[in-house]
Amino acid sequence: MKTKFTLAAITMAIFSSSESMAQTNQSEKEQKFMPEIHGTIRGKYEYQTEEGEGRFEVRNARISITGKVVPMVSYKAEIDLSDEGKIKMLDAYTRVTPVDRLNFTIGQFRVPFTIDAHRSPHQQYFANRSFIAKQVGNVRDVGATLGYKFQGECPVVLEAGLFNGSGLTDQKDYWTKSVNFSAKAQLFLPKGFNVTLSTQKIKPSDHAVMMYDGGVYWHAKGWHVEAEYLFKHYGGNAFNDVHSFDSFINYDIAVKNKKSMVKKVSPLIRYDMMTDHSDGSSYDDNGKLTITDYKRHRLTGGMTISLATPFVSDIRINY
């Protein structure tokens, strides 16, 4: 078992143009096209009780720029200066919204798949991501998506796209005859309920891999209750089917004292599991896919302390 302590998982949403707007009296129309700068810094300390070892780590140091060039065209560029010590270009895309509720996105970004894998670091509930979000269903790629939102008492958000399958780096000389795809449907029900279904096809190497994911959550009255299941099948029975499950409960307790440095305290608990998993590209000497992540079960409990700052500032203590 591991004791994980995350200190100052901070997200700063900085509207760099706000001060200059006030000084130059720019029109509201001009203000809409000013770029916005956002950032996330997340440091943590982990201690492994069985081995008696510990470490400090800068898990994320993200900077992103978003904005619009015209009302129907927006953009985003995001880089992580320290993803466990490595620099990674994460998002670089342009989005066109020709009519209300319809959008077309092209570039590099996280594919529309799963619930938990789509959360940015500042949106995560725990110090470490679930197995679905980290090992089994975490995919960023280069491609294009089409999205549409149906309004009404139960809004529905649909997304579908085609992708290279090259990942984030092998783009220049990457040509393929088989295109990967992903599709996701979100149903927003009354009283804070949500149902999300998604599917994805990838081909990391010689074998195609199909993934199917279904999840539900309830977010209301300070509670967030969520459960998600992912099934992964390898073409040609190249590897055993993979099953992964994630469920957790979070409850926000608001601090009534307005002068307090703490805005809320959130106890939370999670159970997640996965069977033996292959990334689809690692082979042994006999040409068979190898296990890259062994089966495991995990129970995580802890507390998140949210500080009363102008931006998101959380201290997450997990065991």
What residue spans do the PLM features occupy?
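Outer-membrane beta-barrel pore domains
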Residues: 49-51, 70, 93-97, 108, ...
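Disordered, low-complexity tails and leader-like regions
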Residues: 14, 159, 305-307
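A short secondary-structure junction signal
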Residues: 159, 169-174, 196-198, 208
